[in-house]
Amino acid sequence: MKIIARNKKALFDYSIIERFEAGIVLKGSEVVALRAGRANLKDSFVRIIKSEIFLLNSHISLLHTTHSFYKHEERGARKLLMHRKQIDKLLGKVSIEGYTIVALDLYFNTKNKVKATLALAKGKNLHDKRETLKKKQADLEARAAMKNYK
């Protein structure tokens, strides 16, 4: 499993409730750009529109070798492929309980298909983010102390 892009900001801003795997509909030029590692999920988000699920605002750069006929939209909406039951479950959670869906990463699976890891998440408050930073800092200091002890 080769990870193409990871959304680190989502892990900081949201507490992850549940993870899902989804296929993604891409054009040929987008797949070539992903193989070159030209993707960014920083500001991306997921929406359910007419019982179909889309990844919006994800950035896949154009390669300079791509012919103008085959060029894709860099920040276009990309359809995600999931089972109907999973989409309905996500729709119920998002509409009623105040959760959101975020894209965590893009990767090539063992069959060389591009997959996206989605997460059902709830936004963190400012004090939760501070607590996460404090915990991370304490873990780093503990590791450094253990390293120096040996």
From Swiss-Prot:
Q: Which domain of life is it from?
A: Bacteria
Q: Which GO terms describe its cellular component?
A: cytosol
Tell me the Gene Ontology biological-process terms attached to this UniProt entry: trans-translation
Looking up InterPro entries in the UniProt record yields: SmpB, SsrA-bd_prot
Cross-referenced SUPFAM superfamilies: Small protein B (SmpB)
Q: Which family does it belong to?
A: Belongs to the SmpB family.
Briefly state the protein's biological role: Required for rescue of stalled ribosomes mediated by trans-translation. Binds to transfer-messenger RNA (tmRNA), required for stable association of tmRNA with ribosomes. tmRNA and SmpB together mimic tRNA shape, replacing the anticodon stem-loop with SmpB. tmRNA is encoded by the ssrA gene; the 2 termini fold to resemble tRNA(Ala) and it encodes a 'tag peptide', a short internal open reading frame. During trans-translation Ala-aminoacylated tmRNA acts like a tRNA, entering the A-site of stalled ribosomes, displacing the stalled mRNA.
Which protein, by its recorded name, is this? SsrA-binding protein
Record organism: Campylobacter jejuni subsp. doylei (strain ATCC BAA-1458 / RM4099 / 269.97)
Gene for this chain: smpB
